[in-house]
């Protein structure tokens, strides 16, 4: 059907005729996501007419059809202007049942009308900064949270709940002020935690342990999984700075309650491997936002038959995180987005919980036996992580190195032993530890256990490559002293030329363990030696 015909019919305002042409238009354009530039002005006019038409007293079926047309038009970012006015957004939010009002009694729209209105709002808010600003001013988040609070009392269809949560996610992702309003004024962390608990349908065995039947937990149904993931995304947005600030006991209890639910999310699967991976990914992202002291709930559950026990502690959740990490490593896709959250989570957990660190150390860095291959060669988890230490992405290589460094109790010698000095140099240089030593950290004094194979090979291991190198013939064998001196000077001159032309910059290690240009390093060492001589009265 010609667009101008649709526009003319809508302009006439006759309800039955409008309903008929819009039904045809919606059917023809239901899968249309790209639009011709030639008809842009016609679409804008149609959008204006539809918003005005929707303000009239219409039958629910006509409202739904009109909203379906608005949803189709809202896919075109060049036609959003009629929808991004105060009046337009108020009309849509009223039909969605979420317009902010101080009145206690409000008319409840038809459920299909609510659903289509929510879909329209999601499209418009996602694409229009002006709409985002107006929804913040209109306090739509208040109306949304009021309805979410009633999920336990009202029987709403899955799709309405899903798009409620999707709209809330978009608002909190795109507007810092709405994020803060939900977290603080509307007590959003508590509300969304309760909503997650309701969605998962859990029962509690202890304050921070979800009750489970013996054996494998059944997969979370598809609809509940979809809603749970939207809730996790909203919670991620409003807890973004939680790990960086101190929390009082009341907040700590709330975060521990949430952490226990997230542990349960890790322990269950969704409908299919891909959906489970996505569900666990959102769970890991949110766990990384929790205050560090609240991560102890990952280890809280008692050891039961079938649990993975280490040092008397239930390590099921930590082991699942480690398996999740290895799957992400093997997939090798978008490493920064997929790896850094779980690496950071495991690193911080290992830093603050001794049992977690020792368990991860046993899994990732078992006592060395293979000393013939470089640390980055092979298929073990250690090999895969060491390979990341020279990754092109700075964040990825830093996270991998930091994780292994913490497992080594931030001991330089132990770190070099497992990774090789060449791989370790980046982190050591950044930390000012090139001269060796150890970072400040609270770690137990247990010793690293060396295998017989490692002890036997240790004198022959090249610290740079981290393996026993084959003995190569001496290139200077058979040379006279004059020839050796000539080759040495030739090498010095080559380095000097490269340095003067600024192709390379010779670096040295300062007494503090930092890298510095060679002349600076030599000067610092001379100053320190002079200071030492003065202290000894050798002037």
Curated annotation (Swiss-Prot):
- The biased composition feature labelled Basic and acidic residues covers 521-532
- Please tell me whether the keyword Methyltransferase is annotated for this protein: no
Superkingdom:
Eukaryota
A Pfam family annotated for this UniProt entry: Ric8
Residues annotated as region Disordered? 507-539
The molecular function GO annotations come to: G-protein alpha-subunit binding; guanyl-nucleotide exchange factor activity; protein folding chaperone
**Compartments reported by the entry:** Cytoplasm, Cell cortex; Cytoplasm
Q: Which InterPro entries match?
A: ARM-like (IPR011989), ARM-type_fold (IPR016024), Chaperone_Ric-8_A/B (IPR008376), Gua_nucleotide_exch_fac_Ric8 (IPR019318)
User: What are the recorded Gene Ontology BP terms?
Assistant: G protein-coupled receptor signaling pathway
Q: Does the keyword Thylakoid apply?
A: no
The alphabetical list of record keywords is:
Chaperone, Cytoplasm, Guanine-nucleotide releasing factor
Q: Which GO terms describe its cellular component?
A: cell cortex; cytoplasm; plasma membrane
Q: Mainly resides where?
A: cytoplasm
Q: Which family does it belong to?
A: Belongs to the synembryn family.
Say what the protein does: Chaperone that specifically binds and folds nascent G alpha proteins prior to G protein heterotrimer formation, promoting their stability and activity: folds GNAI1, GNAO1, GNA13 and GNAQ. Does not fold G(s) G-alpha proteins GNAS nor GNAL. Also acts as a guanine nucleotide exchange factor (GEF) for G alpha proteins by stimulating exchange of bound GDP for free GTP.
Q: Which PANTHER family match?
A: SYNEMBRYN, SYNEMBRYN-A
Q: What is this protein called?
A: Chaperone Ric-8A
């Amino acid at each position: 059907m010609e667009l101008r015909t649709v526009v003319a019919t809508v302009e006439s305002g006759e309800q039955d005729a409008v309903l008929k042409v819009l039904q045809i238009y919606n059917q023809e354009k239901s899968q249309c996501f790209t639009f011709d530039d030639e008809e842009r002005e016609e679409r804008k006019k149609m959008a204006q007419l539809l918003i005005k038409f929707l303000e009239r007293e219409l039958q629910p079926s006509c409202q739904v059809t009109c909203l379906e047309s608005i949803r189709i038009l809202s896919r075109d970012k060049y036609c959003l202007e009629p929808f991004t006015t105060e009046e337009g957004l108020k009309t849509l939010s009223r039909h969605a049942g979420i317009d902010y009002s101080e009145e206690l009694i409000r008319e409840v729209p038809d459920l299909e009308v609510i659903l289509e209105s929510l879909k329209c709002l999601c499209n418009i808010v996602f694409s229009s900064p002006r709409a985002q600003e107006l929804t913040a001013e209109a306090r739509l988040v208040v109306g949304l949270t009021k309805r979410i609070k009633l999920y336990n009392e009202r029987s709403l269809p899955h799709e309405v709940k899903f798009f409620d949560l999707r709209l809330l996610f978009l608002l909190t992702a795109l507007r810092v002020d709405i994020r803060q309003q939900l977290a603080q004024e509307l007590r959003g962390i508590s509300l969304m935690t309760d909503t997650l608990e309701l969605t998962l349908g859990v029962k509690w065995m202890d304050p921070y342990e979800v009750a489970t039947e013996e054996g494998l937990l059944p997969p979370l149904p598809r609809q509940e999984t979809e809603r749970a993931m939207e809730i996790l995304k909203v919670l991620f947005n409003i807890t973004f700075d939680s790990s960086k600030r101190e929390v009082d006991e009341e907040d700590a209890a709330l975060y521990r309650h949430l952490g226990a639910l997230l542990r349960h999310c890790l322990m269950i699967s969704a409908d299919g491997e891909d959906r489970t991976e996505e569900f666990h990914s959102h769970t890991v992202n949110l766990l990384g936002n929790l205050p560090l002291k609240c991560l102890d709930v990952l280890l809280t559950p008692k050891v039961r038959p079938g649990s993975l026990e280490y040092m008397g502690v239930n390590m099921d959740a930590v082991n699942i995180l480690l398996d999740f990490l290895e799957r992400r490593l093997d997939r090798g896709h978008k490493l920064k987005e997929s790896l850094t959250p779980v690496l950071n989570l495991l690193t911080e957990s290992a830093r603050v919980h001794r049992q977690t660190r020792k368990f991860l150390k046993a899994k990732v860095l078992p006592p060395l036996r293979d000393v013939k291959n470089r640390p980055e060669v092979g298929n073990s988890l250690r090999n895969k992580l060491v390979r990341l230490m020279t990754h092109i992405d700075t964040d990825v290589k830093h996270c991998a190195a930091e994780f292994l460094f913490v497992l080594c109790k931030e001991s330089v010698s132990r770190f070099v032993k497992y990774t090789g000095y060449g791989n370790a140099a980046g982190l050591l240089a950044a930390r000012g530890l090139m001269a060796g030593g150890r970072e400040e950290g609270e770690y137990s004094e247990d010793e690293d256990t060396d295998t017989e194979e490692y002890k036997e090979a240790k004198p022959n291991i090249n610290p740079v490559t981290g393996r026993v190198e084959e003995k190569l013939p001496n290139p200077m064998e058979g040379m006279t002293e004059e020839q050796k001196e000539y080759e040495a000077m030739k090498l010095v001159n080559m380095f000097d030329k490269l340095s003067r032309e600024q192709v390379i910059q010779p670096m040295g290690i300062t007494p503090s363990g930092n890298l510095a240009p060679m002349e600076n390093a030599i000067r610092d060492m001379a100053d320190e030696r002079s200071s030492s001589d003065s202290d000894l009265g050798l002037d």
